[in-house]
């Protein structure tokens, strides 16, 4: 199991948090995703044999947020 901390711009409310967490949790191989709105970060636990960081970034960007 691996962990990645992603910096995300544009998240400001509970809806943002829910949208990003849901998008990530729907990816096969992601075991948990937790958004911290205060610091604009997402902590993701995942199986790196099933999912790549680029797939997680794409899922976040598809929700309208920028991964920096």
UniProtKB/Swiss-Prot annotation:
- Give the Pfam families listed for this entry: HMA
Q: Which UniProt keywords apply?
A: Chaperone, Copper, Cytoplasm, Metal-binding
Q: Does the keyword Transferase apply?
A: no
Binding residues for Cu cation: 13, 16
One MF term in the entry's GO annotations: copper ion binding
> Cellular location of this protein?
Cytoplasm
Mostly located where? cytoplasm
Limits of the HMA domain: 2-68
Q: Could you give one GO CC term from the UniProt record? A: cytoplasm
User: Metal-binding as a keyword?
Assistant: yes
Could you tell me which InterPro entries the record lists for this protein?
CopZ, Heavy-metal-associated_CS, HMA_Cu_ion-bd, HMA_dom, HMA_dom_sf, MerP/CopZ
Q: What does this protein do?
A: Chaperone that serves for the intracellular sequestration and transport of Cu(+). Delivers Cu(+) to the copper-exporting P-type ATPase A (CopA).
NCBIfam families per the record?
chaper_CopZ_Bs (NF033795), copper ion binding protein (TIGR00003)
**Protein name as annotated:** Copper chaperone CopZ
Q: What is the lineage of its organism?
A: Bacteria, Bacillati, Bacillota, Bacilli, Bacillales
